[in-house]
Structures are given as C-alpha cells and as structure tokens.
Curated annotation (Swiss-Prot):
This is Ubiquinone biosynthesis O-methyltransferase. Pfam families: Methyltransf_23 (PF13489). It comes from Actinobacillus pleuropneumoniae serotype 5b (strain L20). Belongs to the methyltransferase superfamily. UbiG/COQ3 family. Keywords: Methyltransferase, S-adenosyl-L-methionine, Transferase, Ubiquinone biosynthesis.
Length: 234
C-alpha cells in the first residue's frame, strides 16, 4: 500500500546528515528524547527484554535509546539516507538494531502464519502528521501489537497555539527546525486521533502534552494537549 508523501520523505532525506548532531536540525528531538523515553518506560513497565517496534524511526534517536534500555528493537522507515545514518550510528555504538526500509502496511502484509511478528511495545513518534492516511498507520500498528502490548503515538494538535509555537516559533523565530518541516493542515486534533484509534479497536489509556521552555531548553509533560501531545493506547 502506498501511504507515502514523497515531499515529506524528501524533507527528511535532506536533513539526514545532521540527524545525530545535538545542535542540528533535530535538536528538538534530542532534547525531547529523555522525557519521552522515560514516559514510555514508565507506562510499559520497563523495556528490558521486550520486543519493540519503532515506526518512522528516521535516524534512530529513539530506537537507540530503547535499545540501550534493554529492548530488542526493530526500526522501520521509508527514507533511505536517514536509515543509513541510523545503521551506521548503531554499529559505531555497539548496538544491535534491526532497521528495515518498509512501510508499516507492507510490514504487516509480509507477515505469515509461520512467522508473525508481534511486539510488546510499538512507538510512532512525530510521524502521523507526515502521512496521507494516519488511520492506515494506526490499524497496522494494532495488527502488530501483542494482546497485552502498549502503543504510543505522538503528534501535534491543530490549534492556533500549535501553529504559533511549532511553525512560527520553532521554524521561523527560534530556527530550531528547518522552515517547511510542518504543514498546519496536517496537524491532528486529539478527537481525530481517538476516533481513528477507536476504529482500530484501540483504547486510549492516557494522553499528555509536551511543553518546552526555550530559555532552559527543557521539556515537561502535563495535561494540556493544545500543542504537541503523546497518547498511550492498548
């Protein structure tokens, strides 16, 4: 199935070389990663020994963090250069991560009765707002989740506040992200996400908002989901 926006892929292909530069194009993700890893570990009751799928893994920032926490990680993405960066960085750091260039829909289609991979934890971070059909991603994640597994989605709410902070603030004023990284009309309201999850027979256990202080460069979580947010589902 072709659930790909080539324009979106091209954006991330161009930024691949700076993926692991903590002061480069992905600085916000590097700053956010410890918080989201801690949240995932708490809600999943730890990652050690668990089988994890990172959907839209890009250059592997979260994949590596989860592998360091003891998980057996598979990372999938449709980009070429970011995946090469991910493989090289993992190898240089002695980490064994199974990176594959595939859509999650094709990943599901390639499952067989004799070899059906299921995962304890599935993460899909900052990806749904970059694809034509988010519901297809959500349904595919559900198909790969173990019955007692935990699924995490993070995305951006379609509000004026999010437009001002994520696009005007982060891309144009603070220049933390390249201009054009996000498109406002692709942002996803929590009610939309929850409706899609309900259609996929997933139930939201918790939803939290990400918040950022540009002075201290620190992220934190609270109940305000008017901008960036993360949802935990089963």
């Amino acid at each position: 199935m072709n659930n790909i926006d080539q324009t979106e892929l091209d954006k991330f292909e161009k930024m691949a070389a700076t993926w692991w530069d903590p002061n480069g194009s992905f600085k916000p993700i590097h700053l956010l990663n410890p918080l989201r890893l801690d949240y995932i570990q708490q809600k999943a009751n730890g990652l050690f020994g668990k089988k994890v799928l990172d959907v839209g893994c890009g250059g592997g920032i979260l994949s590596e963090a989860m592998a360091r926490a003891g998980a057996t990680v598979t990372g999938i993405d449709m980009t070429t250069e970011p995946l090469e960066v991910a493989r090289k960085h993992a190898e240089e750091n002695g980490l064994s991560i199974d990176y594959r260039q595939t859509t999650i829909e094709d990943f599901v289609q390639n499952q067989t009765a004799c070899h059906a991979e299921k995962f304890d934890v599935i993460t899909c971070m900052e990806m749904l707002e970059h694809v034509p059909d988010p519901l297809s991603i959500i349904q595919s994640c559900k198909a790969l989740l173990k019955p007692d597994g935990v699924l995490f989605f993070s995305t951006i709410n379609r509000t004026l506040k999010a437009y001002m902070l994520v696009i005007i603030g982060a891309e144009y004023v603070l220049k933390m992200l390249p201009k054009g990284t996000h498109e406002f009309e692709k942002f996803i309201k929590p009610a939309e996400l929850l409706n899609w999850c309900d259609m996929a027979d997933l139930r939201c256990q918790e939803m939290k908002g990400y918040h950022f202080n540009p002075v201290t460069e620190k992220f934190w979580l609270n109940n305000d989901v008017s901008c960036n947010y993360i949802a935990m589902l089963k």
